[in-house]
Amino acid sequence: MERITVTLGERSYPITIAAGLFNDPASFWPLTRGDSAMLVTNDRLAPLYLESLCERLTQAGVKVDRVVLPDGEQNKSLTVLDQVFTALLAKSHGRDTTLIALGGGVIGDLAGFAAASYQRGVRFIQAPTTLLSQVDSSVGGKTAVNHSLGKNMIGAFYQPASVVIDLDCLNTLPRRELSSGLAEVIKYGIILDAAFFAWLEDNLEALLALEPQALAYCIRRCCELKADVVAADEREQGQRALLNLGHTYGHAIETHMGYGNWLHGEAVAAGMMMAVRAARRLGQFSDADAERVSALLQRAGLTMSGPAEMAPEDYLPHMMRDKKVIAGRLRLVLPVTLGNAEVRTGVADDMVVASIKDCQA
C-alpha cells in the first residue's frame, strides 16, 4: 500500500493507493460508524461496484444513500448536478454528510462541485476508477461542470477529505480510456520529470498490459508530482498552471466537437503536440525531444492531431475563453526542455494557427 499526503495545512489529506481498497470500508477515511454518506456514480460503473461498496459501508455502520447519473462528459452539466442536490435533499442529508465520488473525472468533478456547493460545503471523498482520474483529476481540489461555451467554466477549488485509489478498477477499464489516461501520465514527464519520462519510454507496454507493479509506481509518481505542485500553488496562481500543458488546445477540441466525442486525454494529447510545435517555432524544446514525445504518445495509442473537420482558426475563439487568459491575452503552457515548462503570455494568433497546422502535416 502506498500513501501520499497533499500538504495544505489543516486541509491536508491522504492519497491511498493499493489493490482491493474498495473491499475494505476502512479505506474510506474519515468515514466512521454512525456517519451518513451519499455515493455518487454513473450507470456504467453502478453494476460493477455500487451494491458491493454500499453493502460493505453499511456493514461498517455508515448510512449510505446513492445517486446514479448518466455516463459521459456531456452530462457534466448544471442539469445533472441538480440531480445530486435533489437526491441529497430528498434523503434529508445535512452539513455532516459525506459525498463519495465513485467514478472517473466526470463524476469526481461533478460530485466535488456538489460537495462544495451543498449547504455551503460538505465533506467528500474521491474514489477514482479511471487512470486519468487516478493520476490527475481526483487530486488537487478542482471541481466543476461544463458550459456550452467552455469546459469546466463553472466550479470551485474544493479539496477532498481523502483520495482512495483501488488499482483493481483498471482491470475493467476500456482500452480507449486507458490510452486517454496515459496522456496525462506522459504530461507529467514532459513538464516536471525527465527521468519519469524516460521510465515511461521503458515501461509503456507494461502499463498497457496493466502490469501491477508498473501501474502502482506510475500512479504513485504522478500523484507525488501533482501533490507537490498543489501544495505550493493550490489556486493556480503560478506553477500549477504548468499542469495545463495541452489543455488550452485540448479544451477547444472538446468544446467545439461536442463534449464526449473526444475523450479528455485524447484532446490533451493532440494539444500537447500542438504546444510542442509552438515551442519549436519559438526556438525552444529540441527536435529530438519533440520526436520522443510524439513517439511515446503514438505508442500509447493517442493521436498527434486534432479533428480533421476542425479548422485551425476554429480553435481561437475557444482558446480565448480559457481560464488562463488575462486582460485579453492568451497564455499557453509550453515545454522548454524535457522535464521543464513555462507559461508564455501573449502568443500571437498566427503562431497558434501555425502550431495546429504543423500537427496536421
From Swiss-Prot:
Gene3D superfamilies the record matches: 3.40.50.1970, Dehydroquinate synthase-like - alpha domain
Membrane-crossing residue ranges in chain numbering: none
Cofactor remark from the record: Binds 1 divalent metal cation per subunit. Can use either Co(2+) or Zn(2+).
Domain of life (superkingdom): Bacteria
Residues involved in NAD(+) binding: 71-76, 105-109, 129-130, 142, 151, 169-172
Involved pathway(s): Metabolic intermediate biosynthesis; chorismate biosynthesis; chorismate from D-erythrose 4-phosphate and phosphoenolpyruvate: step 2/7
Cellular component terms per the entry's GO annotation: cytoplasm
Residues annotated as binding Zn(2+): E184, H247, H264
GO process annotations (BP): amino acid biosynthetic process; aromatic amino acid family biosynthetic process; chorismate biosynthetic process
Keywords in alphabetical order: Amino-acid biosynthesis, Aromatic amino acid biosynthesis, Cobalt, Cytoplasm, Lyase, Metal-binding, NAD, Nucleotide-binding, Zinc
Subcellular location: Cytoplasm
UniProt-listed Enzyme Commission number(s): 4.2.3.4
Gene Ontology MF term list: 3-dehydroquinate synthase activity; metal ion binding; nucleotide binding
Pfam families assigned to the protein according to its UniProt record, in alphabetical order: DHQ_synthase, DHQS_C
Cofactors: Co(2+); Zn(2+); NAD(+)
Catalytic activity: 7-phospho-2-dehydro-3-deoxy-D-arabino-heptonate = 3-dehydroquinate + phosphate
Function noted in UniProt: Catalyzes the conversion of 3-deoxy-D-arabino-heptulosonate 7-phosphate (DAHP) to dehydroquinate (DHQ).
Family: Belongs to the sugar phosphate cyclases superfamily. Dehydroquinate synthase family.
Annotated NCBIfam families: aroB (TIGR01357)
Matching PANTHER family: 3-DEHYDROQUINATE SYNTHASE, 3-DEHYDROQUINATE SYNTHASE, CHLOROPLASTIC
Protein name, as recorded: 3-dehydroquinate synthase
Species this protein is from: Sodalis glossinidius (strain morsitans)
Gene name of the encoded protein: aroB
